A protein has these predicted regions:
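Phosphate-binding site recognition
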Residues: 1-204
Length: 204
């Protein structure tokens, strides 16, 4: 079950309401970034892409698959895309009057595969996504790379973000209130897990 994260969800929903939100979410592994994102997008028109260490061509192919499933256009998965801008254009053109969320999870993997990806994304945001009812969410566990390529002054994406969330372990009060535990049991569990959601699963 989803626990806590009230302020983070409020931030994401506020960004959805603005003209063009660009949110960067980062934090250590297993702290619940993907769970937070999936809770946020569950009732929204969203394109969710999880990057991996695969080749750029494979990433584009899978991204096209995400577009195909979300737009219910099977032809998109049959097209061989060679330009990220064309893929992002599909997102922009989908339901132009409806707010959409585009999530790129584990964004640093795309940068590792193609160091120019931040520049490509900057161009896509400025030219294709920003004025087309799209909220962009970049997420990653490699904190140093997220800071360097999404937040730093010398990153092509600098100045684009409208919000950033460094996701921390859950607060004790959230853990205690969400579970049917005595206070002593909750303290013991929190001492062992540190409020890291993935570790808390072992107690379910």
């Amino acid at each position: 079950d989803f626990i806590g994260r009230t302020s983070e969800l409020a931030t994401l929903n506020a960004e959805l309401e603005r003209g063009s939100g660009f949110v960067v979410i980062y934090g250590r592994r297993r702290v619940g970034k993907t769970t937070l994102i999936k809770e946020f997008i569950k009732d929204k028109r969203a394109f969710y892409f999880l990057a991996t260490t695969e080749s750029e061509a494979q990433s584009m192919k899978r991204f096209a698959g995400v577009l195909s499933r979300t737009t219910k256009n099977p032809m998109l998965s049959k097209v061989t895309f060679t330009d990220w801008l064309d893929l992002f254009q599909v997102v922009a053109d989908d339901h132009p009057d409806e707010k959409k969320v585009l999530v790129i999870d584990e964004f640093p993997y795309l940068v590792k595969t193609n160091p120019d990806f931040p520049s490509i994304l900057q161009n896509a945001w400025d030219e294709v996504l920003k004025d087309h009812n799209v909220m962009l969410v970049l997420c990653g566990s490699l904190i140093s790379m997220m800071k360097k390529h999404a937040l730093a002054y010398d990153s092509p994406l600098y100045g684009r973000r409208t919000a950033q969330i460094r996701l921390m372990p859950l607060q004790f009060t959230d853990v205690y209130e969400a579970q049917n535990l005595s206070f002593e049991q909750a303290v013991e569990q929190y001492a062992i897990t540190g409020g890291v959601p993935k570790y808390m699963e072992f107690f379910q």
